[in-house]
Amino acid sequence: MSISTFNFQFYNYKLSPSSPGFGSTASRSSSSCISELEMDIDEDMSAQPTITSTPKPRFTSQLAVELAKTEPGNGISPLRPKLHTAQKRWSMELREKVLEMSKRNNGQEKPQTARQQEQRQPQEQPLQQEELQHQQQEPTVTDKINFFNKLTNTFESGFSKLMPQASSTNNRFIAMLRTARPQNVATTTANSSTANSFLGSDHSLSGSVTGQVPPPKPKRLSATTAQFATPHVPAMGVGKGGSQRKCSLRRKPSMDKSRATISRQSSSASVRTQNHAIMEDLSLVVPVRLRIAEYEQRISMSA
């Protein structure tokens, strides 16, 4: 259907000027009152007066009805051509054109009657043959997949050519696993050969990376690195943790502390920029060790 910007309530309401009764049921049921929306596309619309593109006010008085009656040709001829009907026509014509083109592409150019006669005669005989052909021709899903794989150069499609010796396995992924060189897993251990041993890699391959140095750990946490989160966290004893804690609170700057930490401790509360109070405190609610232990446990579970 053509979509027009008209307000249908207004401009689509037509009185047949002949009927004297203003809102009479007879005029309402007549064909001129069926709105364009309710109409089927394929219905012939030439009988109906067009909706003019210049909107006319709908009749409000008996006098207006009389005037409309005297007007030649059912009112003013529209300024623009009959927009709405024409659009419908065009859509129908387009449909027909498309149909014709598709027929032409399918090689059916003969007039219909001849075609139908031809079809009727040999129809019965080649039915069985067609069925057989269909069974032979119709490609299976795997065929289609393979076809498109050959069509597009994906990593997988070229894979069998690169490594013909691994093609004994039909599973490409496993073949890839077998042929891939061992990766150096990013770990903090000093030599990656030990880290890689669970992958079964050769030590000769990973020897190049043996020079790695583990990243420095903060001094206070180094004692408890291996400790996992447990329901009861051992309380910090005076002997071990207490002394460390005391010296961390002291103002004396030490080498392993970051500059930010030092400045934060040395500045008084009035000087310091106000961070959001709650956010600042929240980081102290969970003791650092516990948090780190929790992260470690998470990592070990995910691995």
From Swiss-Prot:
Keywords linked to the UniProt accession: Cytoplasm, Cytoskeleton, Developmental protein
Single biological process term from Gene Ontology: actin filament bundle assembly
Subcellular location: Cytoplasm, Cytoskeleton
Start and end residues of each stretch annotated as Disordered: 102-142, 185-272
Source species, domain of life: Eukaryota
One GO CC term, this protein: actin filament
UniProt note on tissues of expression: Restricted to the blastoderm.
Biased composition (Polar residues): 260-272
One GO MF term: phosphatidylinositol-4,5-bisphosphate binding
Compositionally biased spans, kind Low complexity: 115-138, 185-197
Its biological purpose: Acts as a regulator of the microfilament network governing cellularization of the embryo. Determines the timing of a key conformational transition in the cortical microfilament network: the proper coordination of membrane invagination and basal closure of the cells. To do this, bnk possibly physically links neighboring contractile units of the early cycle 14 microfilament network in a manner that prevents basal constriction until the proper stage has been reached.
Protein's recorded name: Protein bottleneck
Species annotation: Drosophila melanogaster
Designated gene of the protein: bnk
